[in-house]
A protein has these predicted regions:
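Short, solvent-exposed loop/turn segments at secondary-structure junctions
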Residues: 55-56, 126-128
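Generic short beta-strand segments
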Residues: 121-125
Length: 185
């Protein structure tokens, strides 16, 4: 088996080695899993619900929500509404507790008769420490059928970028890949 490599000159071995390293590096950059239906009716009412931020990066949820709203509208989801928290009771817990804010948003979406809600969580949204400082993003998305509370589609993914890329740019690429099979008809 290794006798084949004896016939390759040193330049060829270096090229072969570099190709193998590049292939391994590129294949390790993105990990994605998806589950559920992928075609949704454009006539149904949609709401973008708050995300849970587990990343430790302040306001990462707001950034993801804005990028996601733009990508969904580009896919043809023209009737997408964005949930905005109304602090009528001057209660700070929903602002500080992502899970509680998400639960209250889902309840409000049900009362407002939305059919689908899209939400999720941010697991990672930062730059890796070290010389390169590459961006690293980890996201979970869920589409919830609001009247039933059933999760009808979900996706999770992680992506790392190169040193010159931004976290938002890497996040946008990951969101685009997560939504690649979703069709709005």
């Amino acid at each position: 088996m290794f006798s084949y490599f004896k016939h390759i000159n040193s330049f060829g071995r270096v090229n072969l080695l570099m190709s193998a390293i590049l292939l391994m590096a590129l294949s390790a950059c993105t990990v994605i899993d998806k589950h559920g239906m992928e075609t949704f009716e454009s006539s149904k009412t949609w709401v973008l619900l708050p995300f849970q931020n587990h990343s430790g990066t302040p306001r990462a949820g707001d950034k993801v929500e804005e990028i996601l709203a733009t990508l969904l509208r580009a896919k043809g989801m023209n009737n997408l509404q964005i949930y905005h928290y109304k602090n009528e009771k001057e209660d700070l817990w929903p602002i500080l507790d992502d899970q509680r804010r998400q639960d209250e948003a889902l309840k409000s979406a049900n009362q407002s008769h939305f059919y689908y809600g899209i939400t999720g969580s941010i697991e990672e949204w930062n730059y890796k420490t070290g010389v390169g400082g590459e961006p690293a993003v980890g996201l979970n998305l869920r589409v919830i059928e609001i009247p039933t509370g059933k999760v009808v589609w979900s996706a999770t993914g992680a992506k790392s970028g190169w040193g010159a890329e931004t976290v938002s740019g890497t996040g946008q690429k990951l969101l685009d890949e997560l939504l690649s099979d979703v069709e709005i008809k």
